[in-house]
Structures are given as C-alpha cells and as structure tokens.
Amino acid sequence: MSTRGWLKIPLLSLALFLSLMSMTTTAHAFSDQVIQHGATGDDVVELQARLQYIGFYNKKIDGVFGWSTYWAVRNYQYEFGMEVDGLVGPEMKAKLEKTTNFNRDFVDRALTQGRKFTHYGGVPKQIQKGPKGSADERRRGREGVRQPRADRPGRDAPAAPRDERAPRREERPAPTPEPTPAPPEEPTPYEEAPDAQDDEANIEKATNVPAGYSDNDIQLMAQAVYGEARGEPYVGQVAVAAVILNRLNSPTFPDNVSGVIFEPLAFTAVADGQIYMTPDETARRAVLDALNGQDPSGGATYYFNPDTATSGWIWSRPQIKRIGKHIFCN
C-alpha cells in the first residue's frame, strides 16, 4: 500500500471520532413533562437555547420560563404550523430537535462560569460569552444585601488601608504599643461560604414533590386553583386541587396534569385566561395538601358555581357537597 493510502486511515479515524463527539454534545435531554409558563430547570435551559439558536428567543438563558420564553414558544409554533398554545409538548420538542441544535456541554459551562449570553445560535463559540459574574449579580439580587466578595478589588479597596496600618503600628519601637485588633481577624467579614456555589450552574432546578409530580405540575395546578377558587375558603381551594388529582386517577380523563387542566371546556380559568395569573402561596399550599392525601371534595371529579352555571348537564350530576360557592359532584 502506498504512503498516501496509509495516511488516509488515521485521517478517516479522526473524522469518525469528531463526528461521534459532535453527536454526543448535541444530543437532546428533554424530559417527558409538558413545559409551560412558570417552569424552571434544565428543560427550560434547553428550550431557550434551541429557540435562541434559530432566532426566536433573544433574552438571557436562565432556565426560567417567563413571558419572553412564552412568546418565543408561541411564535415558533405559529411559524411551524403547530397549535399556538404556549405549551411545549412532544410535538414541539420533536420539531425543535429537527430544526435546531443544542450543545449542552457548552451551555452548561457558560452557566457554570456565571456568564450572561444571548447569542447561542449562528455565532462562533469563542465569542458566545457575556461579562463574567452575572451569576453572582443574580445571586446577590435574590439574597438581599451581602458582604463584598474578596475577589472583587474594586469593592474591597476601602478595607486595604486598615490591613496595612495595623502592621505598621506593631513595627514602631514604642515601649507600650496601644492595643489594636489582630490583623488576621480583619478579613473575616469577607469570608463567604456561599462562594462555593460558583462551581454549579446558576439554574433553578425543577423539584420533584410527592407522588413524582414535578415543580412544573405544581405550578400549573396552583395557577388553576388560583384562577378557579381564589377568595374561596382554604378547604375549598384544596377541594379544587383534589378534583384535578381525582381526574388524573380516572380513566375518563387525560393522564397528565397539563392534559387535565387544558382539556377543552374543562376549566373556566383556561377559557377566560385567568390560568396565566400568578398564583399566591395559599394556592400552592392547597395543591401540596391535596397531593399529600387531603380530599375535602369527597372524591369529586366535577364542581360548579350554581350562581353562574348554565349547563343543564352539570346540574344532572350526582352532588356530593357544597364548599363555599362551589358544588362538588361526580
């Protein structure tokens, strides 16, 4: 075999290795949950990065499904002929995988370094970096007033004269030097244990709750309870959350939280848009109590307000009890 032929073998091997590495770094990692407004975590990071790659999202990648992400999702759905509902389900995830690219290693590394970047797609990786330290700024914003970091010389400058004066007093030959604080104790206000967080990506992780429900599920259920029953007695709010769970356990209804809540004509809050209001802590607590076994509804799968109900069918359902303004039934 000629020398040229021998040279082709390592080159082909290198090309194969690089192609395999490329496939590895761009593999998707979407979970099975339907991603919607209010969600947080790795799914949202991937969603934002993919939407940014194709030009639909131009805000920072922070792992929080806010309104900018919501409208980016709707615009993507419209452009690709899908149902425009702002929900990221299996169909949209599959479409994103076909139309975009996602390098998890690169995105995670940028987030780990606390960098704020808003140009993921179509830009060379070496310039896809914002000013370092955005993670620290976000953390300070969440935790309130904090002591200055020791690695930020601009903020620590006033402390330097104190550290320098103390040693000079000790060097003077005065017979009775006036007592001064020990120099090693000076820097103590600047020792910050939380700095260890710099080694982790600044992303809010989705949290699992009882029975395997994700934080995304909790958020959506809390929005439904708030939209349907705010102002009702607390037990009535728990009962509304219990109805959602009872439907999940019934073969008559969808088998996931978003499917139950967004089923056509199922909830008034979805029809009038109140589902997108920000829930309060009471609504969230009601959901958690229902998840932990409380069911004031008595196993109901329906409820209605007798003062506003116009459907003859709902009045025909076997009634269980009334809590506040709602009648619960099956």
From Swiss-Prot:
Required for spore cortex hydrolysis during germination. Residues 174-187 have a biased composition (Pro residues). It comes from Halalkalibacterium halodurans (strain ATCC BAA-125 / DSM 18197 / FERM 7344 / JCM 9153 / C-125). Residues 1-29 form the signal peptide. The keyword rRNA-binding does not apply. GO terms for biological process: cell wall organization; spore germination; sporulation resulting in formation of a cellular spore. It comes from the Bacteria. Residues 117-195 are annotated as: Disordered. The keyword rRNA-binding does not apply. Residues 134-173 have a biased composition (Basic and acidic residues). GO terms for molecular function: hydrolase activity. The gene is sleB. NCBIfam families: spore_SleB. Gene3D superfamilies: 6.20.240.60, Cell wall hydrolase SleB, domain 1 (1.10.10.2520), PGBD-like superfamily/PGBD (1.10.101.10). Pfam families: Hydrolase_2, PG_binding_1. Keywords: Cell wall biogenesis/degradation, Germination, Hydrolase, Signal, Sporulation. Belongs to the SleB family. This is Spore cortex-lytic enzyme.
